[in-house]
């Protein structure tokens, strides 16, 4: 079964409405489970979510994106902050946030000396230039082991 067929099946089963556009995989997505494109109505999904978290979580993410999709084409509020979106997401048991991926590993850990805020980074940062985003305190590198 193709991804578009799967999304059509979920749309009919959980929303009672047809999905009339295309769904595709997007391997470039890192921290999000999927994306809705209002301009042409297509959906992109992160294949790593299905691989790492299974079909149950992936189906909830499909529901999340279909909430955006159906609300947009009905002319209702389709953004995360809109009440219509939040209510529909609760009704269909969709995920509000995508779960963290194990494949996204941080190599560097920086801690603010003043407030204790932690920052995980894949790439090193210049401690002479960058400061804490919360309190503007000095950052120190903590060894990851």
Swiss-Prot record:
An individual GO BP term: response to stress
Domain SprT-like, chain residue ranges per copy: 5-140
Cofactor binding mode and count: Binds 1 zinc ion.
Principal subcellular localization: cytoplasm
Required cofactor names: Zn(2+)
Catalytic residues identified in the record: 65
Binding site for Zn(2+): 64, 68
Protein name: Protein SprT-like
């Amino acid at each position: 079964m193709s991804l578009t067929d799967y999304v059509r099946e979920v749309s009919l089963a959980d929303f009672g409405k047809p999905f009339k556009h295309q769904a595709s995989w997007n391997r470039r997505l890192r921290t999000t489970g999927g994306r809705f494109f209002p301009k042409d109505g297509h959906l992109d999904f992160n294949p790593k979510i299905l691989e790492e978290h299974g079909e149950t979580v992936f189906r909830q993410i499909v529901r999340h994106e279909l909430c955006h999709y159906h609300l947009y084409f009905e002319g209702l509020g389709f953004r995360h902050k809109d009440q219509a979106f939040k209510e529909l997401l609760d009704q269909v048991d969709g995920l509000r946030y995508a779960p963290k991926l194990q494949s996204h590993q941080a190599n560097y850990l920086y801690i603010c000396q003043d407030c204790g805020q932690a920052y995980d980074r894949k790439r090193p940062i210049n401690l002479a230039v960058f400061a804490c985003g919360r309190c503007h305190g000095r950052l120190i590198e903590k060894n990851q082991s």
